[in-house]
């Protein structure tokens, strides 16, 4: 049996842009994404702390430092300046669960890394 477990999280990151006309996804600063063990194309859940919206999308790696841009239709679910939590999950069996520790990245209001 497998269970869906928290794999990684970027906690309280700030939305820097929302691009309705892009083809979907969330663009995440590449350094921040790698620190959180997120891969391009990986499914993530976004939780907007400001308005309570929750939605799923996939990761695109961004080049700009601190960039967090929600793209496509999901851009209607956030506003620039909103604080969100980016969550990734993984399927794990009992042995993997016992050995796993989620990767949690904390950032400040400018999306600068505070701690991992």
Swiss-Prot record:
Active site, UniProt feature: 25, 58
Q: Per its Swiss-Prot or TrEMBL entry, what cofactor is needed?
A: pyruvate
Q: How is it modified after translation?
A: Is synthesized initially as an inactive proenzyme, which is activated by self-cleavage at a specific serine bond to produce a beta-subunit with a hydroxyl group at its C-terminus and an alpha-subunit with a pyruvoyl group at its N-terminus.
Record's GO cellular component terms: cytosol
EC number(s) per UniProt? 4.1.1.11
Q: Report the co-factor binding details.
A: Binds 1 pyruvoyl group covalently per subunit.
Which domain of life does this protein belong to? Bacteria
> Entry's CDD domains?
Asp_decarbox
Question: Where is this protein found?
Answer: Cytoplasm
| Predominant location | cytoplasm
Listed under catalytic activity are: L-aspartate + H(+) = beta-alanine + CO2
Q: In which pathway does it act?
A: Cofactor biosynthesis; (R)-pantothenate biosynthesis; beta-alanine from L-aspartate: step 1/1
List ligand-binding residues for substrate: 57, 72-74
Q: What class of enzyme is it?
A: lyase
Provide one Gene Ontology biological process annotation: pantothenate biosynthetic process
Oligomer and partners = Heterooctamer of four alpha and four beta subunits.
Task of the protein? Catalyzes the pyruvoyl-dependent decarboxylation of aspartate to produce beta-alanine.
Identify its protein family.
Answer: Belongs to the PanD family.
This chain belongs to which protein, by name?
Aspartate 1-decarboxylase
Q: Which organism is it from?
A: Helicobacter pylori (strain Shi470)
Query: Source taxonomy lineage?
Result: Bacteria, Pseudomonadati, Campylobacterota, Epsilonproteobacteria, Campylobacterales
